[in-house]
Amino acid sequence: MVAFYAYMDTHETNPGRHQTLIFDIAKTNIGYAYNTNSGLFTSPDHGIYMFTWTIICESYGFVYSEIMINSAPFGSILTNSQSITNDHTVTGIVVAEVYQGDVVYILTNPNQPIQRGILSDTFHRTSYSGWKIY
């Protein structure tokens, strides 16, 4: 069995373009395939996996993010609260065939700017999770 759930312990106040997001608190890490120091999930074996990631941006901000398999984008989301005075939350979900040794991680988009910060605290968590389906 392989499954993990991790979140950012604190806000990321100044994320840059093309930055790997590190979810440094792993609440679940069955199989120990997620690394809290690097933000990378390394697949222990071939299979079909589901991955989700949730990004919370500050009010009047926006964050583009992508889920990467090795060095290729597999999915993306935009968290945008530019026109509202509240924080904004978006979750991306993908199902992917992943091979042993493949690396899956969340990256800020290399071509899009980021405005304001990524939020994560006791009341709302920016998080990343994945598990093997088959």
Label for each model-derived stretch:
Residues 1-134:
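Extracellular jelly-roll beta-sandwich "head" domains, especially the C-terminal globular C1q domain
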